[in-house]
Amino acid sequence: LPVSAREAYENPFYLEAIRGVSQLCNKRQYINTVITGESEEEILQVIKTMARSGQVDGFIVLYSRQDDPIAGFLYNEGFLYVLVGKAYAHANQTIYIDNDNLLASQEATEYLYQMGHRRIGYIGTDTSMIFSADRKSGYQTALLQHNILPRADYCVEIAASEKDSAPLRCLLSIPDRPTAVVVSDDILAVTLERVCLEMGLSIP
């Protein structure tokens, strides 16, 4: 799991992924262990200890991040691993499973455009997370296809562990605020909904 166990366990994506992995491992009579921590250094140390114990056959990394030291270690040491998300480095030598995040965001933005919206914002996690970078790119591509220049003040990026809703309030407080927003994941969407309600803004 990515850094910060609390946020990871609050995210339904990770919970569903863990459930699926556990079910399959149980059927095959494999033992699986969930690894997470408060820092990359902590996670990496646990992985090094487990990998070098000789008791681990492989790893499933439930995220993909730019310049990730954990994926880098597994690759450099020749351990078997699978990434959930697009590989940032060594893509041709890495087994990874991904959906088309760029297309998904592009279609979401296009839907809002067809609904009549022209001031469309974007809220995502920081773009070191590959899925978030792709979703932001898809959003920007859809706007440019309609000759709409993406506005920097319409794009908010919040670290996965960030709890401060101030950037969202700032976005919703500008005079010509967006009339619609593309959000990169469910957790941020729930946060945005809460902020809108607190500010007295209606959501269709």
Segments the model singles out, each with a brief description of its role:
Residues 1-46:
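Amphipathic helical "hinge" segments at domain boundaries
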Residues 5-9, 33-37, 51, 56-58, ...:
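Short, contiguous strand/loop micro-motifs
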Residues 42-47, 69-70, 163-167:
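Short acidic active-site motifs
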Residues 45-58, 136-140:
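Short, electropositive alpha-helical surface patch
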